[in-house]
Amino acid sequence: MKAGQQGRSCGLISPYLAPKNQSERFAFIAEWYDPNASLLRRYELLYYPVDGSVEMHDVKNRRTFLKRTKYEDLRVEDLFIGNKVNVFSRQLVLIDYGDQYTARQLGSRKEKTLALIKPDAVSKAGEIIEMINKSGFTITKLRMMTLSRKEAADFHVDHHSRPFYNELIQFITSGPVIAMEILRDDAICEWKRLLGPANSGIARSEAPGSVRALFGTDGIRNAAHGSDTFESAAREMELFFPSSGGCGPANTAKFTNCTCCIIKPHAISEGMLGKILIAIRDACFEISAIQMFNMDRANVEEFYEVYKGVVSEYNDMVTELYSGPCVAIEIQQSNPTKTFREFCGPSDPEIARHLRPETLRANFGKTKVQNAVHCTDLPEDGLLEVQYFFKILDN
């Protein structure tokens, strides 16, 4: 998209909302790392929206790898370049479109932009994420971080000559921020619309349901930021999520008096992230660090190693955790592991709904495997699990 296109009409019908064509199919080129052969294998992945079925072909050997089969865990919304999708326990990376039709239908208007929750609204992150999800965005990256003065200056380089520049820098470095990469058709235009006018006072008059009207205070403390153009979105996302493989600004993990929570992929996919964050906050737990991760099978097996041979659902637990993005959280409170484990409830949501109906798993879980959240079981493991995500995987 060219820089001048962000103001165009946002009323066109998305291919995700259009009636399903009986013969329509989308084609992608996907890669899968085969750990046994230490090879990167390439496939053509075909997806049929009419019945949610998939088909795969081995590109190198020119043969069918998977005949057309119904697969309910893949949606059209998951199909975009760079995403990782799980198809029958294989984690595939979508690297290119397989034909021009797919590129036109799914790629021509798909945009990414930066959504930044500022220090004054971090406590309302759950509500803002809920608004983002309900507005049709997909969150593809998320990380709580703190900005140094230099990082803040790089971010606000366009405001360097403005009279409020120093106040802007002081505010953005006054506490943690939450940076997100969000995706949808016309993302830049639609996120700016959801944000509302830059001054929160004006937003309350002109766009009372907007993010800045609901959670901002004035023109500086205005809850959240959105990129203005395609070019500024690319520049700003590079600051927070470097494509070179660097970590960007420092995460906010404290590694003291903490326990670990992981919001599982099924809950992310079903749009529960915001609601779960609100529930955690309202139960008086401090969310001191949060980040989205796309784990591979080896990482998940390493993390869940203590459950191997002990829990009968171990293999299904592993498959669930690497089936899509998960969100890891450092939780702080007095005696955090015990109190947070009690708040999560029994691992089986059905039992939780009978015995502990106020718990996270009772409210957001589906099955013993898809039970919304993982939490640390033993007090001595709380710090270790937090370190695994925010020190080892983050680096």
Swiss-Prot record:
A Gene Ontology BP annotation from the UniProt entry: CTP biosynthetic process
Primary location group: cytoplasm
Record keywords: Cell projection, Cilium, Cytoplasm, Cytoskeleton, Flagellum, Hydrolase, Kinase, Nucleus, Transferase
One Pfam family from the record: PH_NDK7_N
Gene3D superfamilies for the chain: 2.30.29.170, Nucleoside diphosphate kinase-like domain
Subcellular location: Cytoplasm, Cytoskeleton, Microtubule organizing center, Centrosome; Nucleus; Cytoplasm; Cytoplasm, Cytoskeleton, Spindle
CDD domains: NDPk7A (cd04415), NDPk7B (cd04412)
DM10 domain sequence ranges: 22-110
The UniProt record lists the keyword Protease: no
Gene Ontology MF, one: ATP binding
Reported consequences of knocking out the gene: Knockdown of nme7 in embryos is semi-lethal, the majority of pups died prior to weaning. The most prominent phenotypes in surviving mice are hydrocephalus, situs inversus totalis, postnatal growth retardation, and sterility of both sexes.
A GO-annotated cellular component: nucleus
This enzyme's EC code(s): 3.1.-.-, 2.7.-.-
InterPro entries, sorted: DM10_dom, NDK-like_dom, NDK-like_dom_sf, NDPK7, NDPk7A, NDPk7B, Nucleoside_diP_kinase
Keyword Transferase: yes
Tissues showing expression: Widely expressed. Expressed in the flagellum of epididymal sperm but not in testicular sperm (at protein level).
Protein's job: Possesses an intrinsic kinase activity. Displays 3'-5' exonuclease activity with a preference for single-stranded DNA. Does not seem to have nucleoside diphosphate kinase activity. Functional component of the gamma-tubulin ring complex, implicated in the regulation of the microtubule-nucleating activity of the gamma-tubulin ring complex in centrosomes, in a kinase activity-dependent manner. Part of the dynein-decorated doublet microtubules (DMTs) in cilia axoneme, which is required for motile cilia beating.
Free-text note regarding domains: Contains 2 putative kinase domains (111-243 and 258-391 AA), the first one is involved in autophosphorylation and the other may be inactive.
Recorded family membership: Belongs to the NDK family.
Binding partners and assembly: Component of sperm flagellar doublet microtubules. Component of the gamma-tubulin ring complex.
PANTHER family for this protein: NUCLEOSIDE DIPHOSPHATE KINASE 7
Protein name, entry field: Nucleoside diphosphate kinase homolog 7
